[in-house]
Design a protein with these regions (language model features):
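TPR alpha-solenoid repeat register
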Residues: 44, 77, 110-111, 164, ...
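Alpha-helical segment of the N-proximal tetratricopeptide repeat
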Residues: 33-69, 80
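Structural register within alpha-helical repeat arrays
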Residues: 48, 80-81, 114, 151, ...
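Long, acidic low-complexity intrinsically disordered regions
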Residues: 239-265
Length: 265
């Protein structure tokens, strides 16, 4: 007796102008293991994940889950679903998908996300061990910088503020840089300096981050304004204290004058 097929779940709609050919060549190469029709469909869903990740996470998840159902052994599909879980703070699910993608592809380029997921699960020491693993040596420059940013955050979590600062003092920490990672690197460095108690340094680097953040990835401008206000308040309070001290000195002088007059009498 034949077992009836499980009915296929409805798939989220694809806009007419999305073809799947928008994908990076490396992802297209992964899709070649599928039938032509399936490759086109999975590619379209992966394009939609990227398009919706920042604006509609639930819709992005629907497309990512569809891609995994149709192409569960394609690393890019597992990475897409992992990124959705990562954005939602579902660390264990994200880590599981990233590990599956790494096993399928043999690539460790998602290592910064895996380390951050371990951090999200509260497993800081495991995260640091993973960041120092041999796989990290295979990362590109951009990926190594992203990893350094994550590791600096872990050091801050652990109260290791000096290490958080030193870990970001890379050759790429150049205030004039406008690479895609520049704003995030400057922002993380400012956070590390602030955690260490260097408000002036933090103010400087939040400023660099705001100028480098052409895509609005960070809230550097808000942090800059907030910190600038705090510094100004501290200065004003310092002036008030100085004025209070002067008033106290004037009062003491008046009392001394009164005592002198009493002595003359």
């Amino acid at each position: 007796m034949l077992t009836p097929k499980t009915p296929r779940l409805p798939e989220p709609a694809i806009p007419e102008d999305v073809t799947g050919f928008e994908l990076d060549r490396s992802v297209k190469n992964q899709l070649r293991t599928l039938s032509k029709e399936n490759a086109v469909g999975v590619g379209q869903h992966l394009v939609m994940v990227a398009a919706l990740l920042d604006s509609d996470i639930e819709a992005a998840q629907a497309h990512a889950e569809t891609a995994v159902r149709r192409a569960g052994r394609v690393p890019a599909a597992r990475e897409a679903l992992g990124l959705v879980h990562y954005r939602k703070g579902e660390w264990a699910k994200a880590l599981s998908e990233f590990r599956t993608a790494r096993r399928l592809s043999g690539s460790s380029h998602m290592l910064p996300f895996m380390v951050d997921a371990e951090r999200g699960l509260g497993r800081h020491e495991r995260a640091l061990d993973l960041a120092a693993s041999p796989e990290a040596a295979s990362l590109s420059q951009d990926e190594r910088i992203e990893l350094a940013i994550v590791v600096s955050g872990i050091r801050r979590d652990l109260g290791q503020y000096d290490a958080a600062v030193v870990g970001l003092q890379l050759p790429q920490l150049n205030a004039g840089s406008r690479h895609p990672w520049a704003a995030r690197l400057f922002y993380a460095y400012a956070e590390a300096l602030l955690a260490k108690g260097d408000e002036d340094g933090a103010l400087t680097w939040f400023g660099h981050a705001a100028r480098a953040d052409l895509e609005g990835e960070t809230d550097a401008e808000e942090r800059l304004a907030e910190l600038d206000g705090m510094v100004l308040t501290d200065l004003l309070e310092g002036d008030d204290d100085y004025e209070d001290d002067e008033d106290d000195e004037d009062d003491e002088d008046d009392e001394d004058d009164d005592d002198y007059e009493d002595d003359e009498d």
